[in-house]
Amino acid sequence: MKKFNKDIGTYCENLACDYLIKNNFKILECNFKNRLGEIDIISIRNSILIIIEVKGRYNYEFGVPKESVSVSKQKNIIKVTKSYINYKKLYNFNVRFDVIEVYLNKIDSSYKINHIKDAFRT
């Protein structure tokens, strides 16, 4: 089950990247990892550094995807973001935290993307 969830997560992140590129976002990193944690997607658009958490679901059994980005998860993303900014020396950017929800259809290969801009703040 763990590998299945990881595969679904990777698939959803790829769909999210495609969506972002089609909407004129510049992708800087996918799956950035350091000792503090991971950020799914780091992008830039209109001089804003955008940190994106991707969540995918087949159904609402466990709630809508955004609900799984808990306060502790948000704090961890913020901590990793600060580390990334220092590492890459990206001090002159405003930062925004988004969530991209990917709703997958079990019957066919269709999907729906919901991009929640400014989903949480520092």
From Swiss-Prot:
Family membership noted in the UniProt record: Belongs to the UPF0102 family.
Protein name, per record: UPF0102 protein CLH_1204
Organism: Clostridium botulinum (strain Alaska E43 / Type E3)
InterPro entries (UniProt xref): Restrct_endonuc-II-like (IPR011335), tRNA_endonuc-like_dom_sf (IPR011856), UPF0102_YraN-like (IPR003509)
HAMAP family: UPF0102
Molecular-function GO terms, alphabetical: nucleic acid binding
Pfam families: UPF0102
